[in-house]
Amino acid sequence: MEFKTIGCEDWLNVNEHDAVWDIAQSTISSLTMGELLALDGKDGATFYERLNDEKMNYGWIEGSAEFKEEVAKLYKKDLDPRNILQTNGCTGANMNALLVLVKPGDHVIAEWPTYSPLYEIPRSLGAEVEYWELKEELDWAPDIEDLKRLVRPDTKLICINNASNPIGTVLSSDMLRQIADVAASVGAYVLCDEVYLPMEDTDAYESMIDIYDKAVVTNSVSKTYSV
C-alpha cells in the first residue's frame, strides 16, 4: 500500500514559514494565546494556575467528555457524545473514517476538485474512485444528475467537501438532501469534510449529519476557529 503525498502541503512545508507575505494561508488570522483566553472575559491567570496543578498523565485517551458534549451542541440532531471522536486534526479524522469504511474493490465517488486525501486515500486503500466534478457553468457547483449516473449498486462511499476546498462552493440544504437520497438508494455512506463549515452563514448552513443517518462528518478548530 502506498499513500501519495499532498502536493500543496509539500510546497507549503518548504515555503510558508519563510514568506514575507503569506497569501496561501487557509485559516483566518491566528489568535494569540492571550486573545483566546480573553474570550471568556478573563485574563488567563486562572487557566494557567489550574494548568500548573495538572499532572502530566495520559489524560482522556478516548477524548474529553466535556469537549464531546459541547461539540454535540453544534448540530441540530440529538447526537450521542459517544459518537464524536477526537482526532489529530480533520485530516486525521478523514483518515480514520476512510480506513474503517473503505476496503479493496469498493466503489467510491469523490467530489472533484477537492482536498486530495478525500480521493487519494480511498485509491491507496484499493478502491475504485470516480470523480463527481464541479462545473464552471453551474458556478462551480456539482450536477446531481451526474451523481445519479455515477452511483452503482456497489457504491460504498460518496466523499464531499462543504464548503469546497479549494473552490469555496457551498452546497445548499436542498443539494445535500438530494445527495443523501442518491446515497440511500444504494445504501452508501457519505463522508462530508466540513472544516470550512462556519465560513457560511451558520443559520443557513446545514450539516450532513443532520440530514443523513449514514453520514460521517469531520471538522477542526484550526480553520475558521483559528485555534
Regions found by a protein language model. Name each.
Residues G44-A45, K73, V100-I160, S173:
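PLP-dependent aminotransferase-like
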Residues S26-S30, T91, Y115, S164-P166, ...:
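Short, solvent-exposed loop/turn segments at secondary-structure junctions
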Residues I23-S26, V71, I84, V108, ...:
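Generic structural signal for small/hydrophobic residues in well-ordered secondary structure
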Residues A204-Y225:
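Conserved active-site segment immediately N-terminal to the catalytic lysine
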Residues E2-G89:
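N-terminal small-domain helix-loop-helix segment of the aminotransferase-like
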Residues D106, A127, S185-A188, D213:
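A short helix->loop->beta-strand "cap" motif at the edges of active sites that frequently abuts
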Residues A19-W21, L31-T32, I109, E130, ...:
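Hydrophobic/aromatic beta-strand patches that form the interior of the parallel beta-sheet core
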Residues E136-T202, I209:
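Active-site phosphate-binding strand-loop segment of PLP-dependent enzymes
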